[in-house]
Design a protein with these regions (language model features):
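Feature captures hydrophobic
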Residues: 1-116
Length: 116
């Protein structure tokens, strides 16, 4: 089951990539580093150019680093787990600018809608 979540976490980031644009970059202005504990690290750059999503470590210091497992990422993406609850129960950790972290919900919503 873990491998399935790893594959699906890649699809979540593919969806996020599909909604990146210069408009989103102008609105958000942040680099996010996702450390998926049982998978890869992902960088969501919503600060530079048209925006980008890649695997690995960020080239610049991220405004926000989020650590969670792939199962909780999928649950959050599908709205089965609320970010505040995940944070309060230790299912995810956030380091950096909390206000920038909160803007991710808009990005996740746009990515969910793009997949419909």
């Amino acid at each position: 089951m873990g491998r399935l979540y790893q594959l699906i976490s890649g699809q979540v980031f593919d969806r996020i990539k599909s909604v990146t644009s210069s408009h989103v970059v102008a609105e958000v202005g942040a680099v996010y580093h996702f450390k998926i504990t049982n998978d890869k690290c992902y960088v969501v750059d919503l600060k530079n150019g048209e925006g980008s999503v890649s695997t690995g470590e960020p080239l610049e210091k991220p405004e926000v680093t989020i650590t969670m497992n792939s199962e909780n990422l999928l649950k959050m993406f599908n709205r089965e787990l609320q970010p505040a609850n995940a944070f309060m129960t230790g299912k995810l950790t956030v380091k950096g600018d909390l206000s920038k972290a909160l803007t991710l919900e808009k990005i996740m919503k746009a990515a969910r809608e793009a997949g419909k």
